[in-house]
Amino acid sequence: RAKEVLLQALKLRPRNIQALKLLKIVYLKLRKYKENLELLGCLFELGENVKEEKEFLKALDFLASSLSDEEKKEHILKLQTDNNPMLGRFVFEKYHIFLNQDFSSICDLLYKENKAFNLQNKEYFEFFYALGLIEDEESKDVNFKNSNFKMLKILKENSFKARLEFSYRCTECKSVMPLFFYHCPVCYEFNTCQIIYEVKNNETY
């Protein structure tokens, strides 16, 4: 029903960007990825930056196809993940493949890891050190830049049941959600999910 209403609105006003974005969400829910890729072409013609989203939707289209799991993976890994944090996150979340993704785009997923990696990166190093996944002998005199990680490390060292709690804020409409989103469920924008974390001391943890 929503699809029919939006298509009618676009017949009356074909350059209605908001209606196109709403239709994009409807298509996503219906898993009509090919139609969505065509729709992104319309948004591009109207001046919208859709390059990253287009690659992301290609990944969803491959995932929904009748290809074998290995073929799906092969096609998805050929997509352009550089400078595309959402596609990079998708690859890590789906296949657990590290492609030097930005820490800020996958930190909540990293929280579930039980082995440290990419320690040449300061953010990764501090994070895994705070979680106790790096031996203290390997990291003497750590100078934390991230105050949350420093607090987490201190609390854990003093036998507090400290943890990180995550929430997700849309940088466009400022809505805060309890779960990660690739498209904001409120304003429908892509790649606007900012992962927020804070230290909590939870004795029931």
Predicted regions and their residues:
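Alpha-helical repeat scaffolds
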Residues: 2-8, 33-46, 69-83, 102-121, ...
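TPR alpha-solenoid repeat register
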Residues: 19, 36, 52-53
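Structural motif corresponding to the intra-repeat A-B loop/turn of tetratricopeptide repeats
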Residues: 30, 50, 66-67
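Cys/His-clustered metal-coordination modules, chiefly Zn-binding fingers
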Residues: 116-205
